[in-house]
């Protein structure tokens, strides 16, 4: 009886061990199949490669033009696979395939799409819709507008004509970073329209903002991209030459850069997070508001006057009209007469269309800043292109 009992226990142990081996074998097989499946999936998902963006932080770019495509990721992570000609589209997960060069573009701002077309002096015919104010900043696009080939789509702040946009059958619509544009994006997606977001004004550096030309040009194909890349490298060289000239500066002038609100009647300053402040620091100037971390913010007049009154250089960003003389400037605020920079001839005011040229001619725009901060190193400040020296 005892032997029978022991034999039964032994048989049960063998059965359990066998079952365990079977289950382990099954699990191993499943794991191998899963690993193989993931491996096969990885093989069908081409590697994006290297993000070639050098300065910008709000978009990514993976060019594979030799294989007929380029992958871009916009400011909110939307991924687009730009396929040229008859090239085979790669299988990029969550990537929207778009044939390039695109034929029908809608944009709600001047930069970076319209500015890129102006810089490259081409591709305006692909822009079929834009706000009228942006159209008027581009001579060629204005010409097409007058011919009825470009239409005014409205603007996020005043209202967008959704029906008109849909009827334009755009390949893609480009929107900026305003909160009102979040609503526009949601509505357009509901209508089945492809949308991309560009946060150019959130770039922490000026060169990062300028580099967006590569993003825009990629939608027009490899030739446009290569021209944009070459143009950008020339801008890089201008910046490097400026940095070389100021590298030995030890006496940094104090600088104020601000705007003045006509509606609020108060100053708004550009703090340490703005690309203006970073450019001033690079060119060996000292922004007196660099302890304000936000890019742009309003400050009370008392605080502003306390810091700005004795600054060596004062730069006013102004878009309400031309301000060329002391008389023009004092109409904005008579207290400016007490500023040190006003008395010494170091008070400067932007042209009202400055934002067009900081996108279209960054080399000239940077040189203006270099001359305003260190005129002694750059041949004086009497020949500025996009700022008025107040006299």
Curated annotation (Swiss-Prot):
Keywords: Cell membrane, Lipoprotein, Membrane, Signal. Residues 1-20 form the signal peptide. GO terms for cellular component: plasma membrane. Residues 104-377 form the Fe/B12 periplasmic-binding domain. PROSITE patterns: FE_B12_PBP, PROKAR_LIPOPROTEIN. It is found in: Cell membrane. A lipid is attached at residue 21 (S-archaeol cysteine). InterPro entries: ABC_Transporter_SBP (IPR050902), ABC_transptr_periplasmic_BD (IPR002491). It comes from the Archaea. It is a lipid-anchor. This is Uncharacterized lipoprotein MJ0872.
